């Protein structure tokens, strides 16, 4: 009986927290996110770590970066990110990471900072974004180093 009550209580708590999550609102202006998601600049070193971590950004699974040639598993599906800082503004990079389909409608790149309107999401990730706002800003800061 105690186990049943404990399980029911845990279920109620988890359901309550899932319902309490607010949809992420992005202030898109001209195919860009001009304002930092955190109000502060990102850390390029932390962004590189997110970029390389398979359970976070996992960017090398699809993209190539010459300066990271010592890393394994460079993908060939997405475009090379060499020189990406010269092709896009900081605000454009922020939107491309947060919600790439707003710019590239046919992309298979996931939205790293959305928590609704997604498909094929595992139950434990429903209502959650892949990256936090700070991690998005960190990746943007790292991408800005790729001239």
Q: Model-found features: residue ranges?
A:
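Sec-dependent signal peptide recognition
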Residues: 2-8
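Sequence context surrounding c-type heme c attachment/ligation sites in exported
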Residues: 45-60, 71-75, 128-134
